[in-house]
Curated annotation (Swiss-Prot):
Biological processes annotated in GO: DNA recombination; DNA repair; DNA replication
InterPro entries: NA-bd_OB-fold (IPR012340), Primosome_PriB/ssb (IPR000424), ssDNA-bd (IPR011344)
Domain of life: Bacteria
Annotated protein name in UniProt: Single-stranded DNA-binding protein
Length: 149
C-alpha cells in the first residue's frame, strides 16, 4: 500500500519570517504558524487551544515569504512533515520535526492574497514566475451591480 505525508494549514504567523541563505545562495525561510481549535466544554464554556507549527520553505518561495509576510499574516501552507537531526552548541544531537512547504498562499487583506507554487523539479532553479489568477468563467463578471430587490 502507498503512503501519504501531506500537511495543510491555515493559520497566522507568530513572528516575522526568518530568512537565511544557504551556501548555494538559495534562500531559506523559517516560519512559526499558529492554528487555534475552539470548542465548547460540557458546561457550555468556549475553550481554545493554540498549536504552533514550525514551517520551512526554500528558494523563490522563501524570498516571497520574507518580502510579503509579517507577524500576524494569515497564510495557507501545503507541505510534508520532515524530521532532521542537528547538533547544538553543546555538541548534543537534537531532532526537529517541521513542515517543509511545497505551496504557500497569502490570505486576508490587500497585503496578502497572492500564491506561489514552486517548480515541480526541486533540483533545478527556482526562477519560475507565479501566474495571475485565471479569469472567472462563471459569467458573473458581466453582470450589473444593481440588484432588483
Amino acid at each position: 500500500m502507498a503512503s501519504l505525508n501531506k500537511v495543510m494549514l491555515i493559520g497566522n504567523l507568530g513572528r516575522d519570517p526568518e530568512i537565511r541563505y544557504m551556501p548555494s545562495g538559495d534562500a531559506m525561510a523559517n516560519l512559526n504558524i499558529a492554528t487555534t481549535d475552539t470548542w465548547k466544554d460540557k458546561g457550555g464554556e468556549k475553550q481554545e487551544r493554540t498549536e504552533w507549527h514550525r514551517v520551512v520553505m526554500f528558494g523563490k518561495q522563501a524570498e516571497i515569504a520574507g518580502e510579503y509576510l509579517k507577524k500576524g499574516s494569515q497564510i495557507y501552507i501545503e507541505g510534508r512533515l520532515q524530521t532532521r537531526k542537528w547538533t547544538d552548541k553543546s555538541n548534543v544531537e537534537r531532532y526537529t520535526t517541521e513542515i517543509v512547504a511545497d505551496r504557500m498562499q497569502m490570505l486576508g487583506g490587500r497585503s496578502g492574497g497572492g500564491s506561489y507554487d514552486p517548480p515541480a523539479d526541486r533540483d533545478h532553479d527556482y526562477q519560475s514566475q507565479s501566474t495571475p489568477p485565471a479569469k472567472s468563467n462563471t459569467g458573473f463578471d458581466d453582470m450589473e451591480d444593481d440588484i432588483p430587490f
